[in-house]
Structure formats: C-alpha cells, structure tokens
Curated annotation (Swiss-Prot):
Record function comment: Catalyzes the transfer of a dimethylallyl group onto the adenine at position 37 in tRNAs that read codons beginning with uridine, leading to the formation of N6-(dimethylallyl)adenosine (i(6)A).
E.C. number(s) listed in UniProt: 2.5.1.75
InterPro entries: Dimethylallyltransferase, IPT, P-loop_NTPase
Binding sites annotated in the UniProt record for ATP: 11-18
Region span, Interaction with substrate tRNA: 36-39
Name of the protein this chain belongs to: tRNA dimethylallyltransferase
Site (Interaction with substrate tRNA): 102
Organism, scientific name: Streptococcus pyogenes serotype M6 (strain ATCC BAA-946 / MGAS10394)
Known partners and oligomeric status: Monomer.
Annotated gene: miaA
An example Gene Ontology molecular-function term: ATP binding
Length: 299
C-alpha cells in the first residue's frame, strides 16, 4: 500500500506552529488541517488562538469553525473529519499539513484508527448523550464492566475509550495509511513561557475578555467553556478575582498546559524537535520537508 505523505507540526502553545504551517503551505502547495480541539468552535476565535482571517486567506484551513459552541467534539470525530480532509487535499494534488497541539487527536489519527464501515453519527451522538448523564464513578465502573483499561483515568479519556469500544465494528485498527513527517517546535522553557505571557496579554488586548464573558453569560457549562483561555476568567466576572489575578491564573495554566503538551509529544510521538531561536530555523524546516517529499528547492 502506498502511504500518503503528510506533514504534522506540533509543539507547545504559542510556539509559532500556525506561522510555520502557513509558510510551508505557501511554499509547497499545501493546505492546513487544524489539529486543535478548541478551534473547531465557531465564535471562539481569540481564546483559541485561531488563525486570523488574513492567515486563513494566505492558506486554506480545514477543521476550523465546524461546530457550534453548544456541541461536543471528540478524538473519534476528529479522526473521521481529518481523514476526509486529507483525502480531499490529496485528490487535488496538494500537501496535507496538520497543525495543532492536541496530542490525543493527532495520536489517534496517526496510530491507525481507520473508519471501516459507515458509522451512524446519530448513534454516536446518542451514545455520548447517554454517557454524559452518568456520574464519573458510573463511567469508570462501565470501563470495568467492558474490561477496558486506560493509562490515565479521567472522564474525557474514559468516554473516548467507551466510544471506541462501542463502535469497534465500524473501526479498523489497521496499519496507518499515512507516512507522517512530524516536526516539533520548541525552545528553552523561559523562551516558551515568555511567549505564552505575551500572547495572553495580546489576547486580552484583542477581545478575549469580551469573548469569555459572552461564553460565560450564554454557555458556561458546555465543553467549549472548559478550554484554557475562558474558564480562568469566569471568577473575574463574579467578583471572585481581579482582572490581574485572573490574567495571572490564565498565564500559569497555559504554561502548565504547554508543559503537558511537551511531555505528551516526547513520550508518545516520534517528534523531531527544532528550536525556534536556532539560526535559519524556518529554512532548516523547509529543507527537511522538501527532502521528505523528494523535492528540490526551486532556484
């Protein structure tokens, strides 16, 4: 089987994945697939660090703004959507470039979960609604009943495991159809932390507070509201924190999230990391991708 070559750009939040993805897409006739669990939601732009309108005009983006904030989204759905996007991009002779920091989503796609038959999406949604009615303890007990074990026990991962088990007949855990080049962006911890702090400040200047308040006033309990960037500001809206305290909490939680992202990518994926402050870093990455694709740079 001839595998489809794809480029995957990963790394901690605020490291510059979007800019690199657009640069590669423009140079190599590519299109971008978002691998971020929060960027699927419409109306949540600032807090999710979604590609701006200008950036989306510079390169075609897929899997952005495909869900309402009231809807849930899972790794299972991402795999299905990403496979369709990859097939579409390749059919038009273009290079799929996946950009994102949600390790679970990317690992699920790259490790070989392929949709064999036609999955009844209404059945998937109905099953998830049933699970949503259960307490955490009941969800964990259901894992035991089905003899399902997961490495790190939390509700979201437990529900994903139950979904995969429930619809196993429609899934083929086969050799992956993709040959990925996984590019990791990173740098010294303080460099990353400084970029995170600066990004949060820019987000607040660019409308994050208004976006978070809209979400808090209308949909405070939905899955989308649990993402980093929104829930940290909720205490400010009810007078439990000052804006400065909420901002500091957001920066701290984002730094912790970046650390978890790096741990995931290092332990679970074959990532070749490049320091973003290294000399000629963009050119080095471009050359690596061209080598992977068997291309020579045009003179």
């Amino acid at each position: 089987m001839t595998k489809i070559k794809i480029v995957v750009i990963v790394g901690p939040t605020a490291v510059g994945k979007t800019a690199l993805g657009i640069s590669l897409a423009k140079a190599l006739n590519g299109e971008i697939i978002s691998g971020d669990s929060q960027q699927v939601y419409r109306q949540l732009d600032v807090g999710t660090a979604k590609a701006t309108q200008e950036e989306q005009e510079a390169a075609v983006h897929h899997l952005i703004d495909i869900r309402e904030v009231t809807e849930s989204y899972s790794a299972y759905e991402f795999v299905q959507d990403a496979q369709k996007a990859i097939s579409d991009i390749v059919s038009r002779g273009k290079l799929p470039i996946i950009v994102g920091g949600t390790g679970l989503y990317l690992q699920s796609l790259l490790e070989g979960y392929h949709l064999g038959g036609q999955v009844d999406q209404e059945a998937v949604k109905a099953y998830r609604q049933e699970l949503d009615q259960l307490s955490d303890q009941e969800v964990y007990e259901l894992l035991q009943v089905k003899s399902i074990t997961i490495k790190q026990l939390n509700r979201r991962r437990a529900i994903r495991a139950l979904e995969l088990s429930q619809f196993a007949d429609d899934l083929e855990n086969a050799e992956t159809a993709y040959e990925p080049l996984i590019i990791g962006l990173n740098d010294d911890r303080q460099v990353i932390y400084d970029r995170i702090n600066q990004r949060v400040d820019r987000m607040l200047e660019n409308g994050l507070l208004e976006e978070a308040k809209w979400l808090y006033e209308h949909y405070p309990t939905v899955q989308a509201s649990r993402g980093i960037g929104y829930k940290e500001l909720f205490p400010y809206f009810v007078g439990e924190m000052t804006l400065a305290e909420a901002s500091d909490q957001l920066k701290q939680n984002t730094r912790r999230f970046a650390k978890r992202q790096l741990t995931w990518f290092r332990n679970r994926m074959a990532v070749n990391f490049t320091a973003i402050t290294a000399p000629d870093y963009p050119q080095v990455v471009h050359d690596r991708v061209r080598d992977f694709l068997g291309q020579k740079e045009k003179s």
